[in-house]
Amino acid sequence: MKSKRRKARELAIQVLYSWQISKKIVLFETEKYVIEQNKKYSLDKIYFHKIVTGVIKNIFYIDKIIKKNISKKKNRLDYIEQAILRLASYEIIKRLDIPYKVIINEGIELAKIYGSNKSHKFINSILDKIITNKNNIKIKNF
């Protein structure tokens, strides 16, 4: 059985993915729709809302953090990888109550479910770099 937070992360990835594809969507309506479609699952709705809005409110800062930790060879992320990295980066910087191991593991599991064949290895590598370089991140801007 999946934890309520795992389900919240899965649904957050779906909302962030939709938002990335069409920035015109109304976030509140999309969140409501995703929750309604998944009401049979146990879900931490408050956490779901916090992570979705937290990522979107801080999107430019989060993207800078990700970009600093990605190899120049990988110049373009697919939408799923990007959504997973954005969510996990937000948790690394903002959710100090969650151990880094949990954040990395959740990112890897989401990549295995939704990403391409080797996405989970890529996600693991980038999240590890972000955590390693976390002390160089100016949190006051976040």
UniProtKB/Swiss-Prot annotation:
Belongs to the NusB family. NCBIfam families: nusB (TIGR01951). GO terms for cellular component: cytosol. This is Transcription antitermination protein NusB. It comes from Buchnera aphidicola subsp. Cinara cedri (strain Cc). InterPro entries: NusB-like_sf, NusB_fam, NusB_RsmB_TIM44. Keywords: RNA-binding, Transcription, Transcription antitermination, Transcription regulation. One of its GO terms (molecular function) is RNA binding.
